[in-house]
A protein has these predicted regions:
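Anionic-ligand binding patches
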Residues: 4-135
Length: 135
């Protein structure tokens, strides 16, 4: 995505999602979807989120997931240079959690898993493509 392994701001995370989309445009598809997760500092603690960028027929739409606060132990590890997934593994004594249910799944006890977490933002990013008369 041509950004940091752990995007550290809203802007950097959106840039990563946009770069991911640019990198797949040469493939044959009707829709292109990219996702980039990141963190941003809010009141001395990090919160996590992701950007979704979708393109279809030269039109681009973007949507952001809900944000959620990260535990202070994880925030401190991120400040030390760890990626969120690695910080999760350390704090929660797991392995490869970012490829499973991620921080959102761990922190919500899987009430919201990664698929659910991203799906609302994907649906929201699709709005301009499903309501073409309005966009």
């Amino acid at each position: 995505s041509l950004v940091s392994d752990q995007p550290m701001s809203n802007e950097e995370t959106l840039k990563g999602a946009t770069n991911r989309l640019d990198n797949i445009q040469n493939l044959k598809a009707n829709f292109f979807v990219s996702i980039e997760g990141g963190v941003d500092l809010l009141d001395d603690n990090y919160e996590a989120f992701a950007w979704i960028v979708i393109s279809h027929k030269n039109k681009i739409s973007k949507a952001k997931t809900a944000t959620f606060p990260l535990p202070l132990k994880i925030s401190k590890l991120i400040q030390q240079g760890y990626e969120l997934g690695d910080a999760d593994d350390i704090v929660f004594k797991r392995s490869n959690s970012k490829q499973q249910n991620g921080a959102v799944g761990i922190l919500t006890d899987n009430v919201i898993n990664r698929t659910d977490y991203y799906s609302h933002a994907i649906i929201l990013a699709l709005i301009p493509f499903t309501n073409t008369k309005l966009y």
